[in-house]
């Protein structure tokens, strides 16, 4: 894969959970726990939607940990994760 086509792990992970609509638990650096599905992201923030509440725009620098509710396949089997 050429250098200009390489995606970083963060973008690969967020794109995979966005496409599969995998529910996430997001822990912020101040201890707040958010739950929802990623509907959009860019270099600085993530849009998180949850059941029955308006979407939340979360800045990435405020995130400590992201825990998906199910395993996430990041790479194709034939790629081998390289």
Curated annotation (Swiss-Prot):
<comment type="subunit">
    <text>Homohexamer.</text>
</comment>
<dbReference type="GO" id="GO:0045974">
    <property type="term" value="P:regulation of translation, ncRNA-mediated"/>
</dbReference>
<dbReference type="GO" id="GO:0043487">
    <property type="term" value="P:regulation of RNA stability"/>
</dbReference>
<keyword id="KW-0346">Stress response</keyword>
<dbReference type="GO" id="GO:0003723">
    <property type="term" value="F:RNA binding"/>
</dbReference>
<dbReference type="Pfam" id="PF17209">
    <property type="entry name" value="Hfq"/>
</dbReference>
<dbReference type="GO" id="GO:0005829">
    <property type="term" value="C:cytosol"/>
</dbReference>
<comment type="similarity">
    <text>Belongs to the Hfq family.</text>
</comment>
<feature type="domain" description="Sm">
    <location>
        <begin position="11"/>
        <end position="72"/>
    </location>
</feature>
<comment type="function">
    <text>RNA chaperone that binds small regulatory RNA (sRNAs) and mRNAs to facilitate mRNA translational regulation in response to envelope stress, environmental stress and changes in metabolite concentrations. Also binds with high specificity to tRNAs.</text>
</comment>
<protein>
    <recommendedName>
        <fullName>RNA-binding protein Hfq</fullName>
    </recommendedName>
</protein>
<keyword id="KW-0694">RNA-binding</keyword>
<dbReference type="GO" id="GO:0006355">
    <property type="term" value="P:regulation of DNA-templated transcription"/>
</dbReference>
<dbReference type="InterPro" id="IPR010920">
    <property type="entry name" value="LSM_dom_sf"/>
</dbReference>
<dbReference type="InterPro" id="IPR005001">
    <property type="entry name" value="Hfq"/>
</dbReference>
<dbReference type="InterPro" id="IPR047575">
    <property type="entry name" value="Sm"/>
</dbReference>
């Amino acid at each position: 894969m050429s250098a200009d086509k390489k995606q970083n792990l963060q973008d690969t992970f967020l794109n995979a959970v966005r496409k599969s609509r995998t529910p996430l638990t997001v822990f912020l650096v101040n201890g707040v726990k958010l739950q929802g599905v990623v509907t959009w992201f860019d270099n600085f923030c993530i849009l998180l939607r949850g059941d029955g509440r308006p979407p939340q725009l979360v800045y990435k620098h405020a995130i400590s940990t992201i825990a998906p509710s199910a395993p996430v396949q990041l790479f194709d089997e034939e790629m081998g994760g390289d």
